[in-house]
Design a protein with these regions (language model features):
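Solvent-exposed loop/turn and edge beta-strand elements of beta-rich ligand-binding domains
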Residues: 1-166
Length: 166
């Protein structure tokens, strides 16, 4: 059964690579209202970039969210590209809002059940990503969403979202 939270609360997932002392990812996942909107389910992935040794600057790091066929796929469809804010938050939905809702933007919209695979990569080709004092990450963050149709309501729901990195 899907997790049901009180209005305004959203589940958050965090992981940290303690070996390299780099916070790998933080995701917040939710549908904008929990109600069907023309049988579309929206999911809002986020990551957090941490920088050791000094304060992170807004726009200092660039990231790409790519939909792929599976985790071994290195090419795929670019869903969104954006940079971090002054707190390190990387908010793909603000860069490519497909929900039409400005208060609850989302960059992923699903119109049919299925399992969907994504990769998040740090894009060091962007301008400003050449600070010689910073060791840029080549880590790939992967995540999967599982979209199912609720038999009782017919509504599409994200029943599972999991992630990893390598």
């Amino acid at each position: 059964n899907p997790l049901v939270l009180p209005e305004g609360e959203h589940p958050a997932f965090y992981n940290t690579d303690t070996y390299d002392l780099i916070s790998a990812a933080s995701y917040s996942v939710y549908a904008a209202s929990g109600e069907p909107v023309d049988q579309v389910c929206y999911v809002d992935p986020k990551i957090v970039k941490n920088l050791e040794g000094r304060a992170i600057k807004s726009g200092e790091f660039a990231f790409k969210l790519i939909q792929v066929a599976n985790y071994n796929d290195t090419e795929g469809e670019l869903i969104s590209a954006t940079t971090n804010d002054e707190f390190g938050m990387v908010d793909f939905d603000k860069a490519n809002n497909v929900s039409g809702d400005l208060e609850n933007p989302s960059c992923l919209a699903y119109t049919k059940p299925g399992t969907y695979y994504y990769r998040v990569i740090e894009d060091t080709s962007k301008g400003g990503m050449n600070d010689q004092s910073v060791l840029y990450s080549d880590q790939v963050i992967t995540f999967t969403t599982v979209i199912e149709q609720d038999e009782a309501t017919g509504q599409l729901v994200c029943t599972d979202m999991y992630y990893g990195w390598w």
